Amino acid sequence: MQNDKIKMIKMKIYFVLLIFLMFSCSTEQTIERTPKLLKIGGLIKNSDEEISGMDWYNDNLILLPENLNGYVFAIKKSELDSRINGNDTTTIFPKQIKFNTPNYSELVPGFDSFEAIAFRGYEVYLTIEIRFADSMSCLLARGHIDEKTLEITVPEQNLTVIDVPTYVDNMSYESLVIDEDRVIALFETNGDSLIESPYALSINSSGNDIIKYPL
């Protein structure tokens, strides 16, 4: 039974990677596509915001700045659709949403930045990069989102340490995928020049059960 579950999770990880490759590599190699640039205005245009992660919560695209600044951004799907598939050429102004977290810069030694964000219902999961002069680590934080205001709250105690597979400066777990009741964490790089045996981490919702799955 356990082996069947492991195989199923592996298949889902491979499927996610396959979908990513399908969308990042066009099958029509001879046709050149022109990117459609969208106009974005407001605070998010400031390069210091450094958007590091994003995920959909219902019909809202939530964008996570890497800095500890107390807010995230949200763009409605309808706003994106009207500009990508319609004739709307006006500027999108992402809405600032409260992001309530502890002061990790004081609470967590080596706190560097927020990296990834993912939603499972009203639950929200984030990775926090921990950076020292000669080592790296990562924390998985768990919180919740208000379905009406979109305000995100992360309690101080909901942290799980997830060790990096190897030391590469400024590299940590920067992608999260939800798989039913588990969170799949992917390291920033998985090439064999840096990691001999790359793997994904499957973490349960409470953060007390972590399983490695080879990639």
Task: Label the predicted regions.
Residues T27-L215:
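Sequence/structural signature of beta-propeller domains
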Residues M1-K10:
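Short, basic, low-complexity termini and linkers enriched in Ser/Thr/Gly/Pro
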Residues Y14-F23:
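Sec-dependent N-terminal signal peptides
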